[in-house]
Amino acid sequence: MTVPQLHYVPYDTPVEDVMRILEECGTLVIRNFLDQKTVQNVQNEVDDYVRNWNPGPKYNHDIKTVGSKTKQPSNLSLMSKTYRCEVLNHPWMHAICERMFGPTYGDYWFNGGSILHLEPGEHTQPIHQDHVFYHISKWRRPTDPDLTINFAMALTEFTVENGGTRVCPGSHLWENGHAPPAEEDMVPALMQPGDALILPGSMWHSAGANRSSEYRRGFAASFHPCHFTPIESHHHLPREMVEEMSPLVQKMLGFRTLNLHNNVKVWKAGEGNLEDATGLKSIAV
């Protein structure tokens, strides 16, 4: 099978060009998505957390996709100030999400995030699509809007040898029920720290095998329309931590009211906005 190429674009690529590539190929890498200071800050803030995390699946539904030498700790908005105050504010994330979800769904919010850490000796992850967590994906047609999108960002180099993520460009256009792509159709996303792989829910992908002597580490942030319940709740975050965030991130994490495409309010307090009822402030304004 002839697979389209995986596109690598610079940070200053016009968003219209990025959306065109996503429509045609289903995925791409944005170079220097994060600056090196942000990369290092995230690494410093999560390193002890990751090192003390036991590898392997934590839930039954993870058994097929989380290997015995994979660490995927979540709760990053609590563990990393850089993640909650800078990464989740990223202009590229919101430019893409607004165009992907806005016209059909209206507002979107944060679904969940985790570290993507592979120890040496980890095997190849089964090839999968992220939208299988949504039962309605069984009825989704290739021309329908995606149900979710994931931004996978590199904290270390991603190579073929250390288990960098592989994708099958063009597979987002396959009909439902299509078999996963063959191994020879998977294309490695070769990334430097700070690069980001954009993965809509319909894109077939998987982590590679880590045949190197070093760990491979990245982290993710996924978003979906506000019609859907997020994997992660953030109502355990201290109030002072929430008020350090921008109003946009507060909305992403469920502390503000959202609007559907027809301006119907959801996640509201009575007939008013949740943020008004709780007296929420943002010192980031």
UniProtKB/Swiss-Prot annotation:
Pathway: Secondary metabolite biosynthesis; terpenoid biosynthesis. InterPro entries: Phytyl_CoA_dOase-like. Signal peptide: none annotated. Keywords: Dioxygenase, Iron, Metal-binding, Oxidoreductase. The keyword Oxidoreductase applies. The keyword Iron applies. Its EC number is 1.14.11.-. It comes from the Eukaryota. Fe cation binds at residues 128, 130, 205. GO terms for molecular function: dioxygenase activity; metal ion binding. It is an enzyme of class 1 (oxidoreductase). Disruption phenotype: Impairs the synthesis of anditomin but accumulates andilesin A. GO terms for biological process: terpenoid biosynthetic process. Its cofactor is Fe cation. Pfam families: PhyH. PANTHER family: ECTOINE DIOXYGENASE, PHYTANOYL-COA DIOXYGENASE DOMAIN CONTAINING 1. Dioxygenase; part of the gene cluster that mediates the biosynthesis of anditomin, a fungal meroterpenoid. The first step of the pathway is the synthesis of 3,5-dimethylorsellinic acid (DMOA) by the polyketide synthase andM. DMOA is then converted to the phthalide compound 5,7-dihydroxy-4,6-dimethylphthalide (DHDMP) by the cytochrome P450 monooxygenase andK, which is further prenylated by the prenyltransferase andD to yield farnesyl-DHDMP. Further epoxidation by the FAD-dependent monooxygenase andE leads to epoxyfarnesyl-DHDMP. Belongs to the PhyH family. Homodimer. This is Dioxygenase andF. It comes from Emericella variicolor.
